[in-house]
C-alpha cells in the first residue's frame, strides 16, 4: 500500500464519517433510535487487520493525526551540566553568526528570529529517537493561526493528581465511553503520568475543544472524588485563543523513539498495558465530528466548569447550589468536626456529593480570564482557585463554608452532629468605656449572634470602636490581626481609650533588675514581642515563620481581622487556616477585591452579617459632599500608547499640570481648608510638597518608603499641629488608604487617574470623620481628557 493510497483512504474515511454524523443528527432530531458499536479504546471492537507500514507511511499517519501549527514547532533541549530540560521553538538562524547573538539577545527577544517549519525529517527523527538525551523530541503548538485545533489532549500526572494518575485517567475515560467520545490513552514520557487524546475530523475552535474537555472533566469529578481542580489547567490547548504575540502552550508528541523503547510515550489500554502494534492503533483512530461535539455540548448544558462559588457587589458571600445531589448520595447521619477548618468525614458520601462540597470552597480566578481576554499568556495562572483540602478520611473546608454545608445536609434530611474542637479561650475581665451609636448596636446584634462573620462598613462607621465593644461582650482572650504598623498603633491607642482591662500580668525585668512598665495590651511586630495572651495585636507578617503560622495563633478564643480584605493574600490565609478560635470576625470597608479573590475573605471570616453603605452614612453625617472635576490641558504629544506607569510618571513631571494643581491647593488653604493631596508616585509627593511650602504653615509628607522613625515623627508632628495653623498633607495613596485617621481633613486632591472602586472609597473615607466646624468636604478630581487612557479611567470613576 503506497503513500498515495493511504492519503486517499484517509480522505474517504473522513467523508464517510461526516456523512454518518449528519445522518445521526437527523435521527436524533426526530427521536429515532439507532445503535452502533462503541469502539472507544477498541473495546468490543473487531480488531483491525494488522498491516505493515513503511517508514514513509508511518510518518504520514503520524502527521495526519497530530496536526497543529506547521510553520513553527519546538524541540526538547537538555543541559548535561545542570540536568535541566525544556522546549523552545526551532529557529532556522540559530548559531548563524550573521543573525544569532546569544550574548545580546535571549531567543524569545531576538529580532532576527525566523521559525523553522515542521518537516518530514523532524518527524522521522522524533520517531527514531537517536539522541540519547531526547533532544530530537518534538513539541507541537496545538492552536493554529485561526484559533482552531485538530485534537484535545488531557494531561494527568502524579504531581497534579492527589491519589495517583491512573484513577483520574480512568474517571475521565469512563465519561468519554459513556458519552460515545472516542479517546486514546498515552503513557507519558516519564512513565508517571498519561495523556488522553481526542481527535477531530476537521479543525474546530479551540474554545469549543476546551469546553468539551471541561464538560467531560466536570462529570468525571462527580464520579471520582479525588480529581483535582488543577486538571482544568492541564488541557492542550490550554487557551481559547492565541496570546498576543505568542504561540500558546505546546504538547510533546507521543511515540518518542528513545523512551518508546523503554515502554513510555506509547498508547496503552485501560489496564495501562501497551498495545503490541502502535501503528495499527494510530491507523484506525476514530475522530469526532464537529456535529457530534455540538450535540454533546447541547445535551450537557450545565456550566462546563461546574457550579462554583460566585460573588457580586450585592451578595459577595454567595455560594453555589448543590447540583443533582440525591438523598442516596449521603449517609443517614454524619458527624462534622469544627476546628481550624470544618472537617467532613468521607464515609458514606458519594463522589458527586464530595465534589459539590469541594465546589463550595472554589471559585473562578478572575486573573486568568482577564489575561485570556487581553490575549496575554496564562501560563501558571489557574482557572479555578480551591481552598479545600482532601485527606484519606476527611474533606476539610474553610470555617466560613459551614452554613452552606449545613444547608445542603438539612435539605437532604441528613441527621447532623458537630463536634466542636475550637479553642474557647480563657475568660478575661474587660469592660467597654464607650457608648455605641444606634447603627453600631444593630451591627453588634447581628454579629454577636454568630461565631463567625464579616462587618462591611464605611470608614466613618467606627469599626475599631465597635470591635472593642465586641471584645467586652465576648470576654475571651483575643488576638487582633493587622497588616501594617499604623493600624497596630491605632488599635493600641483605641484599646487604651475604650477598653478597661482588669487583668494582672507578670512585668518583665530590665537589665538592672527593675520591673519595666508594661501594658496589658500585647503587641507583636518586627523587633518587639510583648504578647500576654489577654488582648494582643499582631502584625500578620510576624505571625509567620518560614511560611508557617506560629503556634501562638491557636491560643485565643477570639480572633479579629482588621481590613480583612487582605485575607486573600497568601500570608493572611496561611495564618487564618491555622487559627482554632471559636470566634473569628473580619472588619472591612471594601469587601470586593480588585483581583476578585473576595470569596476567600468570607471562607475564612464568615459571610457578611451586617453592611453599612456610604449612602447610609451620608444621611447621618453633618456635612455636605462636593465633587470638583478639574480638566487639565495636558497632552501626550509623543505617544498615546504608554503604559499606566509610564503615563503617571509623565503626568508627575509636567510642570504646567503641577502648577495647575498647586493653584487649587493654595486656594483651599486660603479658605482655611485642610487638604490631603494624593498621588501614586513618591517623587511626585516630594515635588508637590516642595511647591506647597510657601503657602502653608505645615506641609507633611507621608510615603511608604520612609523609615519607621520618619513615619513616627511625621505622625507625631500631625498630632501637635494646632487647629489655628494651616496644614497640607501630601501622601501616596497606598500609605494613606488604610489605618490613617485624621478627622481635620476636609479636602481631597486626586492628582493621578484611578478607577478601582475600593481605592475611591478608601481615599474619600479619609474626609468623612466628624470634626468640629466641618460643614463641607470637597474632592478635586483631575481629568486629563486629552489622553485616551485617562479619559477612559475618568468615565469608570463616574460609574462608581
Residue ranges and their predicted role:
Residues 2, 10, 49-192, 199-211, ...:
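Signature for HUH/AEP ssDNA processing cores
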Residues 137-170, 201-317:
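DNA replication initiation modules
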Residues 465-497, 681-683:
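Conserved Walker A/P-loop ATP-binding site and its immediately adjacent core
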Residues 487-523, 527:
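Conserved helix-turn-beta segment of the N-terminal RecA-like "Helicase ATP-binding" lobe
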Residues 528-531, 687, 697-734:
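Conserved helicase ATPase core of P-loop NTP-dependent helicases/translocases
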Residues 557-558, 565-626:
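Post-DEXD/H (motif II) to motif III coupling segment of the RecA-like Helicase ATP-binding lobe
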Residues 591, 755-775, 779:
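Conserved SF2 helicase motif VI
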Residues 639-680, 687-691:
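Conserved interdomain hinge at the start of the Helicase C-terminal
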Amino acid at each position: 500500500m503506497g503513500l498515495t493510497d493511504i492519503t486517499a483512504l484517509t480522505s474517504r474515511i473522513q467523508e464517510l464519517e461526516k456523512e454518518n454524523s449528519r445522518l445521526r443528527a437527523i435521527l436524533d432530531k426526530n427521536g429515532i433510535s439507532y445503535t452502533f458499536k462503541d469502539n472507544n479504546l477498541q473495546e468490543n471492537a473487531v480488531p483491525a487487520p494488522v498491516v505493515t507500514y513503511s517508514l514513509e507511511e508511518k510518518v504520514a499517519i503520524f502527521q495526519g493525526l497530530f496536526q497543529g501549527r506547521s510553520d513553527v514547532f519546538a524541540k526538547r533541549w537538555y543541559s548535561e551540566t545542570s540536568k535541566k530540560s525544556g522546549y523552545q521553538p526551532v529557529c532556522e538562524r540559530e548559531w548563524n553568526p550573521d543573525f544569532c547573538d546569544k550574548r545580546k539577545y535571549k531567543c524569545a527577544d531576538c529580532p532576527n528570529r525566523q521559525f523553522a517549519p515542521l518537516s518530514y525529517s523532524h518527524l522521522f527523527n522524533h520517531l527514531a529517537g537517536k539522541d540519547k538525551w531526547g533532544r530530537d523530541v518534538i513539541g507541537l503548538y496545538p492552536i493554529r493561526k485561526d484559533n482552531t485545533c485538530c485534537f484535545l489532549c488531557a494531561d494527568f500526572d502524579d504531581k497534579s493528581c492527589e491519589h495517583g494518575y491512573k484513577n483520574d485517567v480512568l474517571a475521565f475515560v469512563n465519561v468519554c465511553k459513556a458519552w460515545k467520545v472516542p479517546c486514546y490513552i498515552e503513557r507519558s514520557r516519564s512513565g508517571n503520568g498519561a495523556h488522553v487524546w481526542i481527535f477531530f475530523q476537521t479543525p474546530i475552535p479551540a474554545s469549543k475543544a476546551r469546553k468539551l474537555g471541561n464538560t467531560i472533566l466536570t462529570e468525571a469529578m462527580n464520579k471520582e472524588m479525588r480529581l483535582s481542580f488543577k486538571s482544568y489547567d492541564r488541557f492542550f490547548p490550554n487557551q481559547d485563543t492565541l496570546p498576543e504575540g505568542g504561540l500558546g502552550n505546546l504538547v510533546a508528541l507521543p511515540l518518542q523513539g528513545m523512551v518508546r523503547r523503554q515502554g513510555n510515550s506509547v498508547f496503552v489500554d485501560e489496564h495501562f498495558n501497551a498495545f503490541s502494534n502502535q501503528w495499527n492503533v494510530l491507523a484506525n483512530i476514530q475522530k469526532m465530528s464537529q456535529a457530534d461535539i455540538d450535540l454533546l455540548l447541547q445535551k450537557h448544558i450545565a456550566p462546563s466548569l461546574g457550579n462554583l462559588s460566585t460573588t457580586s457587589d450585592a451578595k459577595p458571600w454567595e455560594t453555589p447550589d448543590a447540583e443533582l445531589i440525591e438523598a442516596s448520595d449521603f449517609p443517614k447521619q454524619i458527624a462534622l468536626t469544627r476546628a481550624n477548618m470544618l472537617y467532613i468525614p468521607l464515609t458514606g458520601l458519594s463522589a458527586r456529593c464530595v465534589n459539590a462540597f469541594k465546589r463550595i470552597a472554589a471559585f473562578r480566578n478572575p486573573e486568568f480570564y482577564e489575561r485570556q481576554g487581553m490575549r496575554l499568556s496564562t501560563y501558571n495562572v489557574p482557572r479555578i482557585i480551591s481552598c479545600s483540602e482532601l485527606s484519606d478520611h476527611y474533606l476539610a473546608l474553610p470555617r466560613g463554608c459551614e452554613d452552606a454545608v449545613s444547608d445542603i445536609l438539612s435539605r437532604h434530611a441528613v441527621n447532623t452532629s458537630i463536634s466542636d474542637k475550637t479553642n474557647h479561650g480563657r475568660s478575661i475581665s474587660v469592660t467597654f468605656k464607650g457608648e455605641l451609636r444606634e447603627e453600631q448596636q444593630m451591627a453588634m446584634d447581628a454579629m454577636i449572634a454568630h461565631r463567625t462573620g464579616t462587618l462591611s462598613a464605611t470608614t466613618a462607621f467606627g469599626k475599631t470602636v465597635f470591635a472593642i465593644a465586641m471584645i467586652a461582650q465576648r470576654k475571651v482572650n483575643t488576638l487582633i490581626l493587622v497588616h501594617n504598623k499604623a493600624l497596630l498603633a491605632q488599635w493600641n491607642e483605641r484599646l487604651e481609650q475604650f477598653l478597661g482591662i482588669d487583668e494582672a500580668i507578670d512585668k518583665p525585668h530590665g537589665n538592672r533588675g527593675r520591673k519595666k512598665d508594661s501594658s496589658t495590651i500585647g503587641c507583636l511586630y518586627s523587633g518587639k514581642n510583648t504578647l500576654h495572651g489577654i488582648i494582643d495585636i499582631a502584625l500578620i507578617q510576624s505571625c509567620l515563620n518560614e511560611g508557617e503560622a506560629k503556634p501562638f495563633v491557636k491560643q485565643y478564643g477570639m480572633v479579629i481581622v482588621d481590613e480583612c480584605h487582605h485575607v486573600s493574600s497568601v500570608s493572611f490565609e496561611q495564618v487564618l487556616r491555622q487559627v482554632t478560635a471559636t470566634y473569628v470576625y473580619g472588619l472591612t470597608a471594601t469587601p470586593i477585591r480588585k483581583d476578585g479573590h473576595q470569596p476567600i475573605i468570607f471562607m475564612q471570616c464568615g459571610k457578611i452579617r451586617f453592611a453599612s453603605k456610604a449612602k447610609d452614612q451620608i444621611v447621618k453625617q453633618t456635612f455636605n459632599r462636593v465633587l470638583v472635576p478639574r480638566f487639565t490641558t495636558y497632552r501626550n504629544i509623543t505617544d498615546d500608547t504608554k503604559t499606566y506607569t509610564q503615563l503617571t510618571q509623565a503626568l508627575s513631571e509636567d510642570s504646567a499640570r503641577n502648577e495647575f494643581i498647586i493653584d487649587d491647593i493654595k486656594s483651599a488653604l486660603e479658605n482655611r481648608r485642610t487638604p490631603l493631596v494624593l498621588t501614586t508616585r513618591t517623587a511626585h509627593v516630594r515635588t508637590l510638597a516642595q511647591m506647597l511650602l510657601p503657602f502653608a504653615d505645615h506641609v507633611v509628607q507621608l510615603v511608604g518608603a520612609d523609615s519607621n522613625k520618619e513615619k513616627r515623627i511625621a505622625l507625631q508632628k500631625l498630632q501637635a499641629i494646632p487647629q489655628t495653623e494651616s496644614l497640607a498633607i501630601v501622601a501616596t495613596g497606598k500609605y494613606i488608604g488604610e489605618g490613617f485617621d485624621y478627622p481635620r481633613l476636609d479636602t481631597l486632591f486626586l492628582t493621578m487617574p484611578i478607577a478601582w472602586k475600593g481605592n475611591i472609597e478608601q481615599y474619600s473615607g479619609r474626609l468623612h470623620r466628624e470634626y468640629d466646624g466641618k460643614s463641607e468636604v470637597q474632592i478635586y478630581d483631575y481629568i486629563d481628557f486629552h489622553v485616551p487612557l485617562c479619559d477612559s479611567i475618568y468615565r469608570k470613576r463616574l460609574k462608581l
